[in-house]
A protein has these predicted regions:
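Conserved catalytic alpha/beta core of Sir2/sirtuin-type deacylases, generalized to analogous enzyme cores
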Residues: 11, 50-52, 57-63, 71-73, ...
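Short acidic/polar capping segments at secondary-structure boundaries
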Residues: 3, 18-21, 60-64, 84
Length: 185
């Protein structure tokens, strides 16, 4: 309904929280797409997949008005890059874990788009004022020390856009440090 591209994969958070966000609709769905959307929201017979109050975004900088509406409508937590720099990885991690204290399992999805555009060349949507590699490593390593973390993924690495394999190497370094911390726990 709201993704500017019109592609169903442009609304993963909306699908996860079971939200059509029709009040911000920019597309009319044909019957086939509507059925696919409903199937996607109900995959696994779990609906919604996650509660909006259990979502935290870190270093979210560039989003469409439709996404902003969804975040504000549901009061989803957003921590800016400036907050990470001002408060440090340990304090941000502590704040997030305290906010999610009622959750039994925490899924960490690291989108390389959250890195600053000066280093995130191998992704489809690089944006300035993002996190530095070391800041991400510190944040992820702090999260990985918590036993509630049940899954960790790295998304949006696009090798066809990468320059000299830099993005892949950064993602690998972050993954390697995360795995090392998991092995120590």
């Amino acid at each position: 309904y709201t993704t500017p591209s019109g592609n169903i994969h442009g609304m993963p958070m909306a699908a996860s929280i079971g939200e059509d966000n029709k009040e911000m609709s920019v597309h009319e769905l044909d019957e086939k797409t509507f059925k696919q959307w409903e199937q996607l929201k109900n995959i696994g017979k779990i609906y919604p997949k996650v509660l909006p109050e259990d979502v935290v975004f870190i270093s979210l900088r560039d989003f469409e008005k439709e996404e902003k509406h969804l975040i504000e409508k549901h009061g989803m937590k957003v921590i800016t890059t400036a907050e990470v720099r001002r408060n440090g990885a340990e304090n941000v991690c502590r704040k997030v874990l305290r906010y999610l204290s009622d959750c039994t399992d925490i899924y960490v999805s690291f989108d390389v788009d959250s890195l600053d555009s000066s280093i995130s060349k191998g992704t489809g949507t690089p944006v300035s004022n993002g996190l530095r590699e070391r800041e991400v490593e510190d944040l992820i390593s702090k999260f990985m020390q918590n036993r509630k973390i049940c899954c960790f993924e790295i998304t949006e690495v696009n090798p066809t856009l990468d320059k000299e394999n830099l993005m892949a190497e950064i993602a690998f370094n972050i993954l390697q440090r995360s795995v090392n911390i998991l092995m120590m726990n």
